[in-house]
Curated annotation (Swiss-Prot):
Coiled coil: none annotated. Keywords: Ribonucleoprotein, Ribosomal protein, RNA-binding, rRNA-binding. Part of the 30S ribosomal subunit. It comes from the Archaea. It comes from Methanocella arvoryzae (strain DSM 22066 / NBRC 105507 / MRE50). One of its GO terms (cellular component) is ribonucleoprotein complex. One of the primary rRNA binding proteins, it binds directly to 16S rRNA central domain where it helps coordinate assembly of the platform of the 30S subunit. Belongs to the universal ribosomal protein uS8 family. GO terms for biological process: translation. This is Small ribosomal subunit protein uS8. One of its GO terms (molecular function) is rRNA binding.
């Protein structure tokens, strides 16, 4: 079976594990973009520690869940967002103001929309979590 979108698969695994009340999950295969998205989610307090495990193929990521995710998913197509358009996309993907996080890929790396707004840069929306 071929995975069309590994990031969507990873967020689906996390959401399903959170829904069933598990304390950890394994994301297979691992990639840099998934690791960077998990780092942003960890910085925002949605997941605990995570570690890369080499299985001889692409590797796996073991993620500790802390039960704070209500919903998460990818944004397709990957919309380009200017620094002045952030609020429009917050209204579209997040349930309330200052609740949840949009995860962006920018020229400075993967970051939350809060950090991108502080730096005054835009990017492309990868995912949302709340």
């Amino acid at each position: 079976m071929v995975l069309m979108d590994p990031l969507a698969n990873a967020l689906s695994v996390i959401k399903n594990a959170e829904t069933t009340g598990k304390t950890d999950c394994v994301i297979d295969p691992a990639s840099k973009i998934i690791g960077n998205v998990l780092k942003v989610m960890q910085d925002q307090g949605y997941v605990g520690e995570f570690e890369f495990v080499d299985n001889g193929k692409a590797g796996q990521l073991k993620v500790k869940l802390i039960g704070k995710i209500n919903k998460c998913g990818v944004v397709k197509p990957r919309f380009a967002v200017g620094k002045t358009e952030m609020e429009k996309w917050e209204k579209r993907y997040l349930p309330a103001r200052n609740f949840g996080t949009l995860i962006l890929t920018t020229s400075k790396g993967v970051m939350s929309h809060y950090d991108a707004a502080k730096m005054g840069i835009g990017g492309e929306i990868l995912a949302y979590v709340y």
